[in-house]
């Protein structure tokens, strides 16, 4: 082609000497690029680990830059590896890994990650629960097109309300088909969002009915099923209740087919203040009519009631399937003190 001829002469094929000279000329810039990329990588890893120092939006920008750093390090490796190494099996392995990594980096930079599983819909309804204060959970019901494959109770999705913010993970807080369909036959699903971070604190003021929403998913296997030979124990704290709301909806008589393989369960729910908890009345109602039965036990922090791994082990001796969704500290405590025979299933949204 004309491009090859411009680079390598009229024949369009680089003589071996010219190719080696070209690689030799690249060695100095490749060395500098690799060195600076390595320093940037160390700094970005440190910032990623120290998440409290960085809000989500700047962290996301740094995260999106990771593929560029990988490509710089790949160039560094390709140019500086000894020529003799490329003829050895180790060189073939390195070349294959670098090629696959570079392809993945370019795929990410092009914005194609999760694209096939992304569905564009709109907000069907939005309301602030409880007293309507800025710290209360937000219920968002989304209407999705026919391309949405449906979900299973307990799954989550990545949701984008604002293109500048990117995707955020939220649990789907409704059972399949429990909300019916929109006016044009759209599938409806519910999100319950607690204003905890710099992004979610402003959603209640920014979301509007009819606003576009992109949902990628669904993902996850947090189905609360477990083995019939084990006690099924659910532990929820705060907004970690949302997957269990979906699981409980699936156990209602009107949608009993969604819980055909379910077993009786015992739900331990931890709340800061039971009297003002906007999710608790619905939780009690769902537990009262669930089939198979779900026994509810509430721990009110305002009354000094705390759930501990030791108390849980005493109440549920023997093998159990423990399903947990809530603050990382409580999850770590349950994991660290897990009694023999516990099988811990843990929902975690520590994405950074």
Residue ranges of model-derived segments:
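Ferredoxin-reductase
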Residues: 113-214, 232, 264-266, 270-273, ...
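FNR/FR-type flavoprotein reductase catalytic core
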Residues: 1-109, 180, 186, 195-352
């Amino acid at each position: 082609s004309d491009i090859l001829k411009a680079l390598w002469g009229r024949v369009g094929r680089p003589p071996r000497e010219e190719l080696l000279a070209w690689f030799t000329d690249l060695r100095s810039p490749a060395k500098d690029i690799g060195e600076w990329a390595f320093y940037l990588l160390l700094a970005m890893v440190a910032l990623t680990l120290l998440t409290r120092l960085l809000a989500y939006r700047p962290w996301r920008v740094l995260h999106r830059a990771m593929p560029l750093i990988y490509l710089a390090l790949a160039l560094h490796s390709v140019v500086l590896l000894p020529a003799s190494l490329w003829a050895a099996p180790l060189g073939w392995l390195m070349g294959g890994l670098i090629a696959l990594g570079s392809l993945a980096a370019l795929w990410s930079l092009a914005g194609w990650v999760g694209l096939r599983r992304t569905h564009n819909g709109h907000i069907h309804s939005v309301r602030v629960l409880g007293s309507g204060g800025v710290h209360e959970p937000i219920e968002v019901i989304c209407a999705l097109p026919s391309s949405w494959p449906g979900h299973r109770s307990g799954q989550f999705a990545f949701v984008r309300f604002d293109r500048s913010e990117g995707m955020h993970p939220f649990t789907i807080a409704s059972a399949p088909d429990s909300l019916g369909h929109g006016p044009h036959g759209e599938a409806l699903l519910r999100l319950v969002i607690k204003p905890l971070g710099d992004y979610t604190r402003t959603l209640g003021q920014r979301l509007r009915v009819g606003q576009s929403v992109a949902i990628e998913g669904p993902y996850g296997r947090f189905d609360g099923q477990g083995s019939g030979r084990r006690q099924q124990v659910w532990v929820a704290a705060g907004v970690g209740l949302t997957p269990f709301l979906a699981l409980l909806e699936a156990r209602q008589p009107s949608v009993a087919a969604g819980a055909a393989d379910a077993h009786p369960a015992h739900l331990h729910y931890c709340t800061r203040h039971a009297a003002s908890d906007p999710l608790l009345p619905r939780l009690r109602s769902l537990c009262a009519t669930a089939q198979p039965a779900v026994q509810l036990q509430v721990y009110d922090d305002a009354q000094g009631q705390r759930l501990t791994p030791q108390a849980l082990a005493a109440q549920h001796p023997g093998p159990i399937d423990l399903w947990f969704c809530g603050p990382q500290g409580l999850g770590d405590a349950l994991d660290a003190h897990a009694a023999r025979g516990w099988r811990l299933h843990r929902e975690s949204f520590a994405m950074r």
